[in-house]
């Protein structure tokens, strides 16, 4: 199992490598009890998402769900349980801080919008879902995915230009804290 360290950089755009209709960059990776990390280049991309300088971004104006392209990460879980996804992203402003996200099915709008807290350059952020919340208060923070043993796909759809995804890690979710009486 390969582990990739997270790298902190500043946001920057460069010459894009545009996605083709379907571009496979990596095979399925196993997610063990300790988790699994992926660089953005491990995704299968469809336009208008693009890969440049080792990050994924939307090449067009704000996209509706059906127009945002896809970044698909294939992985396999060896231990059933609850998982969360930690990322390294750049979300510099309110117009550049969201993706659509789901596992094993296309995301649904607006429930599965991931509103990313603003960053100063590339920073770690855990995926959440808007659900019944709004752009400043997601309902599911963090979003915990219950996964069975076997093959899975993480689907990320572009939503706002300028939101950059550098890497991600699928990790076992920490145990839930008991409710305070």
Feature annotation, model-predicted:
Residues 7-16:
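Bacterial N-terminal signal peptides
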